[in-house]
């Protein structure tokens, strides 16, 4: 069994489901420890204690061949800045949003538009006011007749990224090729947005069936957003029609973290800006048919749209955090009661990889 194979070569570790899952949660726990140092001045002793103890012991369930590991239970602090908890929440939100979209598409016969609305990069002390400005502008934009007559509801998620690289790396250059090429910048040059923040909205908008008469072009979306923000310098927005509800790429974009721990844990000063900007903010908003469908989801009335987890789980695997790593603490067969409780249940999260 994989749990006993302690001499497995490094090159095979990524092929080992146990090691892969262990490495994933180890990375989040290490980020959680870093968070506890940065967040200490802002929270009570009890909250800090909960954050420090988050994920100290976790239990997985796995099949007889140990090909799939599913997180079964653990103590989670549920703090919105906790890397471990935000990771877990994003997986559950991915399922939630995908189910709402399935329901709205099949039962209400609406289509979807995926919209990313951006603003220019800003300094940390501008974040709070800029987010408020974006919220007002978004509300104003949706009141425009050409949008109001087309839309039936939306999900809006706030995300903030931080430009921590001082120089343009190969990875950055490939990601922002058009931006750099337009400015005659190359790999190794100073990154023009170094030490700035980029707040933006990821939105899924439910719309009536579109045709050539009522479809809003990307150019028009950009104009409407520029007018609502009163900023003609905004150039980067993205508009996509979501053709298939089975294509979850857009769902993951909306469900993923509002801020990546790799960004907000760069240093204490950067974290302070993120914390003050996001503390108390509503990060994800449901409106119209999405809000109505969310009520049905919470009541369990959309469970018929969920799939059954077909994996037969037979083992429980417990890991304890000791100093700087997780140590295998428990490996046992599930009890008869646990086996009945766990197996043949509806899925409660989407099994997906969300970028760190």
Report the location of each language-model feature.
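Right-hand nucleic-acid polymerase module
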Residues: 1-197, 207-356
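Short beta-strand->loop micro-motif that forms the acidic, two-metal-ion catalytic signature
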Residues: 202-206
């Amino acid at each position: 069994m994989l749990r006993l194979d302690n001499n497995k070569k490094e090159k095979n570790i990524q092929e080992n489901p146990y090691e892969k899952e262990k490495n994933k949660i180890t990375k989040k726990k290490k980020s959680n420890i870093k968070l506890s140092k940065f967040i200490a001045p802002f929270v009570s002793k009890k909250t800090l204690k909960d954050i420090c103890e988050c994920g100290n012991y976790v239990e997985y369930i796995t099949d007889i061949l140990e090909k799939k590991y599913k997180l079964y239970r653990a103590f989670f602090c549920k703090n919105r800045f906790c890397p471990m908890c935000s990771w877990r929440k994003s997986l559950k939100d991915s399922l939630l949003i995908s189910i709402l979209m399935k329901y709205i598409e099949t039962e209400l016969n609406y289509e979807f538009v995926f919209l990313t609305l951006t603003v220019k990069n800003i300094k940390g002390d501008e974040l709070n006011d800029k987010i408020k400005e974006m919220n007002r502008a978004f509300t104003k934009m949706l009141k425009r007749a050409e949008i109001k007559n087309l839309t039936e509801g939306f999900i809006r998620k706030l995300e903030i990224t931080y430009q921590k690289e001082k120089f343009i790396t190969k990875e950055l250059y490939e990601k922002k090729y058009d931006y750099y090429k337009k400015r005659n910048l190359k790999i190794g040059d100073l990154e023009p947005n170094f030490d700035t923040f980029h707040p933006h909205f990821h939105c899924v908008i439910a719309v009536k069936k579109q045709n050539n008469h009522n479809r809003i072009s990307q150019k028009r979306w950009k104009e409407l957003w520029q007018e609502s923000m009163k900023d003609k310098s905004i150039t980067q927005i993205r508009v996509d029609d979501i053709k298939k509800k089975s294509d979850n790429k857009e769902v993951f974009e909306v469900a993923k973290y509002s801020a990546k721990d790799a960004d907000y844990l760069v240093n204490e000063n950067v974290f302070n800006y993120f914390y003050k900007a996001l503390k108390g903010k509503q990060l994800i908003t449901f409106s119209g048919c999405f809000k109505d469908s969310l009520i049905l989801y919470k009541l369990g009335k959309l469970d018929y749209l969920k799939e059954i987890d077909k994996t037969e789980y037979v083992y429980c695997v417990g890991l304890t955090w000791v100093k700087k790593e997780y140590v295998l603490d428990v490996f046992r067969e599930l009890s008869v009661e646990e086996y009945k409780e766990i197996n043949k249940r509806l899925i409660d999260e989407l099994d997906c990889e969300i970028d760190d």
